[in-house]
Amino acid sequence: MQSSKPIESHGQPIAGGKLPLICVPLVGHTLDEVMAELAIVLPKKPDVLEWRVDFFESIGDVAAVIAAAKAIKSKAGDIPLLFTRRSVMEGGEKIALNEDQVIALYGAVCESKAIDLIDYEMANETANIAQVRAAAKSNDIKLVLSFHNFSSTPGLEALASKFLMADQLGADIAKVAVMPRDPNDVLILLAATQQASQKLRIPLISMSMGPYGSLTRLFGWAFGSALTFAVGARSSAPGQVPIEDLNTVLGILRKAMGDGQTTP
């Protein structure tokens, strides 16, 4: 029934190809805060961890960022780590780095091999995307090219073009997150996801945000989204559901839909 393509890391499907994967964000401002979050999150057994480095107050210190990434990875063990700088324009925190410095940071973190996946926004210049893609590919790191709209939901064709753009730009995974104004917007996002999952060669991640959009975090996988985000300690976006609640609902949905998978 699912049309989702599993997300891989280092040549293997994450969590044995489980769909959807559950990703929990880490949003601490200091390494101590991040490690405290990690202590809360790890017992809840997420499939992927996302480190939102735009929250990290030492983001301008490349050595400190790499050391923190290695510390997270050491504690996380086999759980893949997604490294993300979210821009202010797409819902992230304000940082004191220009885009050239961000790209240099991405390159250094990729070379450190302390991460498994990296997120970069497809709104960036094509040349910048190419640099990040090259750094990721040369270090066996999967590239997520993402698009976020925190004010509205574009039309079906516009959303479809975003998924296609990520594929054309060389992404390993395409991510689209939008804000619905009504239930119809949620249906548009799900329809775009289903269409894209049938046409594209790469896995997709999609979600509507906010109260209406929380539904997509629960059953978007049935329409082709391979991963969903959940709250482990602190939320990084509106509409995220606590991981415990998400696991419960996913278990019920899988059983109802005849899926043999079980939640951890």
From Swiss-Prot:
Sample GO molecular function, one term: 3-dehydroquinate dehydratase activity
Source species, domain of life: Bacteria
SUPFAM superfamilies: Aldolase
Keywords: Amino-acid biosynthesis, Aromatic amino acid biosynthesis, Lyase, Schiff base
Catalytic activity: 3-dehydroquinate = 3-dehydroshikimate + H2O
A GO biological-process term: amino acid biosynthetic process
InterPro entries recorded: Aldolase_TIM, DHquinase_I, Type-I_3-dehydroquinase
Listed pathway(s): Metabolic intermediate biosynthesis; chorismate biosynthesis; chorismate from D-erythrose 4-phosphate and phosphoenolpyruvate: step 3/7
UniProt-listed Enzyme Commission number(s): 4.2.1.10
Amino-acid biosynthesis is among the record's keywords: yes
Active site: 148 (proton donor/acceptor), 175 (schiff-base intermediate with substrate)
Function: Involved in the third step of the chorismate pathway, which leads to the biosynthesis of aromatic amino acids. Catalyzes the cis-dehydration of 3-dehydroquinate (DHQ) and introduces the first double bond of the aromatic ring to yield 3-dehydroshikimate.
Family: Belongs to the type-I 3-dehydroquinase family.
Subunit structure: Homodimer.
Name of the molecule in the record: 3-dehydroquinate dehydratase
Protein source organism: Albidiferax ferrireducens (strain ATCC BAA-621 / DSM 15236 / T118)
